[in-house]
C-alpha cells in the first residue's frame, strides 16, 4: 500500500474542496460589486468564513425527501455528481504529480461525460414535472456540446501529439494559433457546466429551480459543490491546454493557478453580464455554428501537425 500516494491524492481533493468553497465566496463578492452593493461581509473578517457557515447551515438541516420520489437514485445522484467532480481533480497536473495517467485527456473525457447521468438521475428520481423537464434540457444540452468539446480537444491533441496533461505544460503557443478554438472551447465549457447564459437545467423563470427543485439541505449543497468544482477543473484544463507556460517548477504552478483564477472569474463575469438564451438558439449555436467550426479547425490541425 503506497501511503505517500494516497496522502498526496487526499490532500489534492481536500484543497480542491477548499478552493471550491472560496470560489463561491468570490462569486458572491464579485456579483455584489457588479450589482453596486456589498457581497457577504458580516460573518467573521470581511465575510471570509461565509462558505463554512453556509456549509454548516445546510448540512445540519433536516433532509426533506418527497414521498413520490424514487429514494435510492434521489439520494445517490448528488453524491455521484460530487464524486465525479473530485475524480477529475486526481489528474491535476502540478509539478510534483503523484498520480500519473499517460492518457489523462481520455480519462478527463470519460469522467466528464458521466456528469450527464447525475443530472438525469436527479431530475427523474424527483418525480416532479419541473425537475424532469430541467433534467431533459440538461441532458440534451450536455450531449450536444460534448460533441463540439471532443472535436476541439481532438484538434489540440493532433497538434500537441500527446494525451498527457503534464506534457502539455511545455507548449505555450497553441492559444495564439487557435484563438477561435479557445473561444469556442470556453463557451462550450459554459454549456457543459450549466452556467449562464446556458443554465437551462435550472431555468428559474420557467422551471422554478429545474432538476434540483426537490432537493434541500445537504443534498442541495452537494449538487452545487459538484457544479463549482467542475467550473474550477474546466478552468484548470483550459489553462493547461491553451495557455501553458514555458516556466518550470514552482513558477509554472504559480502561473497555472493565476490563469485558472482568471478563467474562473470570467465565468462570474459572464453570469453578471448576459441573460439566459432561448433554448432553440442554444441548440442552433452548437449544431449549426460550433460543430462546423470545430470540424473545420480539426481539418486544419492535421496539416499543421504534419508541418511541425
From Swiss-Prot:
Catalytic activity: a ubiquinone + NADH + 5 H(+)(in) = a ubiquinol + NAD(+) + 4 H(+)(out)
GO cellular component term, pick one: mitochondrial inner membrane
E.C. designation(s): 7.1.1.2
Pfam families: NADHdh
Localization of this protein: Mitochondrion inner membrane
Coiled-coil stretches noted in the UniProt entry, renumbered to this chain: none
Main location: mitochondrion
GO MF annotations in UniProt: NADH dehydrogenase (ubiquinone) activity
This protein's record includes keyword NAD: yes
Key words, A-Z: Electron transport, Membrane, Mitochondrion, Mitochondrion inner membrane, NAD, Respiratory chain, Translocase, Transmembrane, Transmembrane helix, Transport, Ubiquinone
Residue ranges of the TM segments: 3-23, 73-93, 103-123, 143-163, 168-188, 217-237, 250-270, 288-308
Entry's Gene Ontology BP terms: aerobic respiration
Class in the EC hierarchy, top level: translocase
Recorded topology in the membrane: Multi-pass membrane protein
Annotated family: Belongs to the complex I subunit 1 family.
Function: Core subunit of the mitochondrial membrane respiratory chain NADH dehydrogenase (Complex I) that is believed to belong to the minimal assembly required for catalysis. Complex I functions in the transfer of electrons from NADH to the respiratory chain. The immediate electron acceptor for the enzyme is believed to be ubiquinone.
Name used for this protein in its record: NADH-ubiquinone oxidoreductase chain 1
Organism (species): Lumbricus terrestris (Common earthworm)
